[in-house]
Amino acid sequence: MSYMPAQNRTMSHNNQYNPPDLPPMVSAKEQTLMWQQNSYLGDSGIHSGAVTQVPSLSGKEDEEMEGDPLMFDLDTGFPQNFTQDQVDDMNQQLSQTRSQRVRAAMFPETLEEGIEIPSTQFDPQQPTAVQRLSEPSQMLKHAVVNLINYQDDAELATRAIPELIKLLNDEDQVVVSQAAMMVHQLSKKEASRHAIMNSPQMVAALVRAISNSNDLESTKAAVGTLHNLSHHRQGLLAIFKSGGIPALVKLLSSPVESVLFYAITTLHNLLLHQDGSKMAVRLAGGLQKMVTLLQRNNVKFLAIVTDCLQILAYGNQESKLIILASGGPNELVRIMRSYDYEKLLWTTSRVLKVLSVCSSNKPAIVDAGGMQALAMHLGNMSPRLVQNCLWTLRNLSDAATKVEGLEALLQSLVQVLGSTDVNVVTCAAGILSNLTCNNQRNKATVCQVGGVDALVRTIINAGDREEITEPAVCALRHLTSRHVDSELAQNAVRLNYGLSVIVKLLHPPSRWPLIKAVIGLIRNLALCPANHAPLREHGAIHHLVRLLMRAFQDTERQRSSIATTGSQQPSAYADGVRMEEIVEGTVGALHILARESHNRALIRQQSVIPIFVRLLFNEIENIQRVAAGVLCELAADKEGAEIIEQEGATGPLTDLLHSRNEGVATYAAAVLFRMSEDKPQDYKKRLSIELTNSLLREDNNIWANADLGMGPDLQVGSLQGASALILLLYIFSISPYRLFAGYDTLPIDSMQGLEISSPVGGGGATGNSGGVNSASAGSGAVVPPSGAPTSPYSMDMDVGEIDAGALNFDLDAMPTPPNDNNNLAAWYDTDC
């Protein structure tokens, strides 16, 4: 039974009475009488007035008293009155056990078993004063005990180390084994562990025991000791200086799991914290052994191994090549496919991320199925794992443009674009940009899973973050050209309110790489007639002309500088972008926009036709081609044709009829044809003769060995010069003379739909593939009859066999070319 002096108790009556402090020398009998006078026992309420309050009308207890945990009922604590003898006994018991209570609180281990000590604690949640004071004393006692034990351990180890070193060097393997196990036990205590690591002779003896002993138990004990030492920097240094790394690497071939664990964790600690360890592990052949260990199935063990590989491979090309030669990519991809332990997946993805920047490892990872394996974890709940997978996928994506079976990855990437993490969105946009480059299947897949809508929203939400907008714009540029759903994508950008945002990206402070991508996207969007008016209303033509003038001025200044100094300076660059690329891109976009009459009128008002004419003299054939193309569209209007002629375009256009670039020659012929519509018959006759002569010039050279400025993949043996002839014959074939039997005269209104790609080489501004192989032309491709000249442009042209003797042209009419935009310049579908 707990007892609490009256002075420390809280009464439950409304009229509380606290007696004055008792004199220090009052007998127990007098104290009892005073307690009785103070109504602590059997109070009737007459003397104290404790129950004289008016009872509640509701008959309920006071709400405040009802919920107060400190209130208590005296009748419960004292069910009956105590006699004087009982009170004396209680006082005597408390007095006699006071020292025992103090001892129990401060030194409980000194009490004898079976002794019951009365407690003075009334509330279990409130410790007594003695209990509160005992906490610091217990801490002090434990500190003293630990200090004594530490000192004992240190002294013991210091005295034992010399003898243990001798035993470790003994020739008897049994002695060595016993000594190694003893040292291992000592290393488990901090004091003796410090004594061991402070002894270079002891660490060296342990390393020798590992290297020379064939006994598994002694090896296990010795490497276990090194493992314990490796948790301290001083121990790591001692192991490194004693030549422990080669010995530990050797143990990576051990068949014993515990030895392997000790060895790999010790090496891991060395690689993390000890300078020089990386090179030592490489020289000892550790990389090869670690790659071999990847075949094991213990996930925690594999996590340590992969982390070691990441440390060794990071920033070291030689290590990456060693991992490749040892079959590392295949094993790492297997781990990503086979396990779900987050830490293992994270460490493995870190290794793959390091290897993915190596040009040699990149295709190996892709071939091993790395893209699909990494895609499996894009929905993982671990942000760090998802981030590593995305970075790795982005690094690999430029080598995976021809990989099939990426539908699940593409769908996941489209979903990831909705993330609020800037890094995640940046990676996803970059991966989509690379995987949709020149891959029609991936383009169609992304469009079908809502990729266009997601990319437009991404661009809108990105604001001025060019690390997001640039890859997103590039991805849209790819999706809007050269695949079955490209027209749907072109419309989807407009329907998702993306045109205004895209045009605004042409404004400052956008940098040139982003501007270049936007120009290509606008050019592709203009292929959809429904986009012509919105693009014009959002100011696309004005900004394209502004950029063209700026880039043209930069290139002209560069030309003048070269002419003045005579030096061969490189082309004008800005943020890594050649200004010639901007010239080509803007003129190409204006070329497509000029297919619409209102756009042609606006372009004429910009006073930019003189620049187009001057670009006909440019040494870069791609620029000549787009310049001739936009002039071809502008010449469809009488006003445009007159301005072109006034700017002196007839001369350069006539010269370009002799160009070895098929597109340039064809556009030049078309412009001259349109300019001649209002000319006298004599002028038309002279132009007809000029065209005939240009086609028949150096006939043998053209058909045998002429260099058309095309890449080897686009040249077809001795027939390489025939494509330009086919194009020109197509343009001028329909005449009263009916050079090709079976073709009816068609009304000609415009060149809309004619799209002539530039071939590779010949001074192309971008250096990208400019043509599309006929094998990939799609359903629009037409195979010429046997013996007829072939061309990469045959997919857009449907012509019969050519009568080589009928080479007369009548300039009264020109047919409308087929409206097929599959064969576009590759400048608009690259990731450059």
From Swiss-Prot:
The keyword DNA damage does not apply. GO terms for molecular function: cadherin binding. ARM repeats lie at residues 149-188, 191-231, 233-272, 275-314, 359-397, 398-437, 440-481, 487-527, 597-636, 638-677. InterPro entries: ARM-like (IPR011989), ARM-type_fold (IPR016024), Armadillo (IPR000225), Beta-catenin (IPR013284). May associate with CadN and participate in the transmission of developmental information. Can associate with alpha-catenin. Accumulates through wg signaling; arm function in wg signal transduction is required early in development for determination of neuroblast fate. Arm and Abl proteins function cooperatively at adherens junctions in both the CNS and epidermis. Keywords: Cell adhesion, Cell junction, Cell membrane, Cytoplasm, Developmental protein, Membrane, Repeat, Segmentation polarity protein, Wnt signaling pathway. It is a peripheral membrane protein. Belongs to the beta-catenin family. It is found in: Cytoplasm; Cell membrane; Cell junction, Adherens junction. The keyword Zinc does not apply. Residues 765-792 are annotated as: Disordered. SUPFAM superfamilies: ARM repeat. GO terms for cellular component: adherens junction; cytoplasm; plasma membrane. This is Armadillo segment polarity protein. It comes from Drosophila pseudoobscura pseudoobscura. One of its GO terms (biological process) is neuroblast fate commitment. Residues 771-789 have a biased composition (Low complexity).
